[in-house]
Amino acid sequence: MQAPQTTVDPSEIAKFEAMAAEWWDENGKFKPLHMLNPCRLDYITTQIAGEFDRDLASPEPFKGLRILDIGCGGGLLAEPMARLGADVVGADAAERNIPVARVHAEQSGLTIDYRHTTAEALAAEGEQFDVVLNMEVVEHVASPIDYLIACRQLLKPGGLQVCSTLNRNPKSYVMAIIGAEHVMRWLPKGTHEWSKFITPDELYDLLRQSGMDPVDRKGFVFNPISWSWKLSGRDLSVNYVTASVKPA
């Protein structure tokens, strides 16, 4: 049997392999994601609750939903989804991330199925999910359209994909490359390549080409005064997130 094609970029994976042990250090190399996580979770939970008619005030609102966190890293999103009752699979192409994620989940009393694999491999295996979380991954793959097609194949009809990435414009270069990597040193230099960033309109087009119906998009906006992130319906100039649905 022929192995599935992959959009994994080995040079991108190597960057995150080198940082694997630091995933749960809130002041370490993944500090930006820890800061962004409450905002990401706000958007994700709202979209899932709306799409599947779930009450977020209930004890386990996502019980019965199967969620894939692709590019799961150390489990910063997978763990909250499990706490909300979902059956969670966390997948990452960086092998060293998986034992870090597994140990932390065990220490937290959570059952999460972590796998060293890719979207393409999971699709080839016939895996199906209600929700695919595709957060800060698409700007690191070799072929965004092929990757997004694999993500669509992983969804059940009527399933939801939440995809976040970085806009490509002068402001995002200043904020995400110069600011985050060189000035603030939140991330190691070279973590991102500005040429791989994707504009919101480009991402909407790619989602449609992959067979998805985009239904929403918001910006993640950093406030340097409060040192926190917020969702914005208008400012998609740097970080942004989209929701799309697979036709039933």
From Swiss-Prot:
Enzyme Commission number: 2.1.1.222, 2.1.1.64
Top-level taxon of the source organism: Bacteria
Gene Ontology MF terms in the entry: 2-polyprenyl-6-hydroxyphenol methylase activity; 3-demethylubiquinol 3-O-methyltransferase activity; polyprenyldihydroxybenzoate methyltransferase activity
Residues binding S-adenosyl-L-methionine: R40, G71, D92, M135
Pathway(s) this gene product operates in, as recorded in its UniProt entry: Cofactor biosynthesis; ubiquinone biosynthesis
BP term (GO), one: methylation
Record key words, sorted: Methyltransferase, S-adenosyl-L-methionine, Transferase, Ubiquinone biosynthesis
Gene3D superfamilies to which the protein is assigned, alphabetical: Vaccinia Virus protein VP39
Pfam families found in the cross-reference section: Methyltransf_23
Substrates-to-products reaction catalysed: a 3-demethylubiquinol + S-adenosyl-L-methionine = a ubiquinol + S-adenosyl-L-homocysteine + H(+); a 3-(all-trans-polyprenyl)benzene-1,2-diol + S-adenosyl-L-methionine = a 2-methoxy-6-(all-trans-polyprenyl)phenol + S-adenosyl-L-homocysteine + H(+)
InterPro entries associated with the record: SAM-dependent_MTases_sf, UbiG_MeTrfase
Family under the similarity heading: Belongs to the methyltransferase superfamily. UbiG/COQ3 family.
Function: O-methyltransferase that catalyzes the 2 O-methylation steps in the ubiquinone biosynthetic pathway.
Record protein name field: Ubiquinone biosynthesis O-methyltransferase
Annotated source species: Roseobacter denitrificans (strain ATCC 33942 / OCh 114)
Gene: ubiG
